[in-house]
Amino acid sequence: MEVAAHEFLMALLETPSPSGYEQTVQEVVREYAGRVADEVTTDVHGNVIACRNSAAPLRLMIAGHCDQIGMVVIHIDDNGFLYTQMIGGWDPQQLIGQRMTVWTREGPVHAVIARKSIHLLNEQERKQVAKLEELWLDIGAKDKADAARVVTIGDPVTLELGYREMRNNLANSPGMDDKVGLWVAFEALRRAADKPFKCALYAV
């Protein structure tokens, strides 16, 4: 993979963008598209639209979405634990013990998801599927006041972001759905930029 393309993919995957909180990653896309597009605009919904050869009568659009599943902080209890509401579809069973990041105005705050300890669960509780309201985020706060000094109700939360390469030229990262599709759309525009084509090419 070319260096510029790889750096763009990394930037997308390492930039948080839960649904409703996509502005930061949209800035990444605008900057990248601006290098090769004839024009880059943003519509009222926040869609970033980059175009080459806009005067052509035939138009072709390649689209991807930049948001990812996440959470939003809705409550801080007396112990300083954070409770959240889902943004998108999560399986709570897969969340226990996950490293998370709360994206605050002052910067990222590291957290881990916890629940009632296994040795404290009765037999019936052990058989039940975990629910989101039974899970909390521990940021290491001493109490509610300590947590509230860094976290605000409404702050978005994601899995700890990052990128790991695996065997056979594969990789994993939170948010690959659909940031890889977004990357394909704008990388296609970049690669087509120095080639002759008869249509107006839009990456959205």
Go through the PLM ranges and name each one:
Residues M1-V204:
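N-terminal hydrophobic/helix-forming segments and targeting peptides
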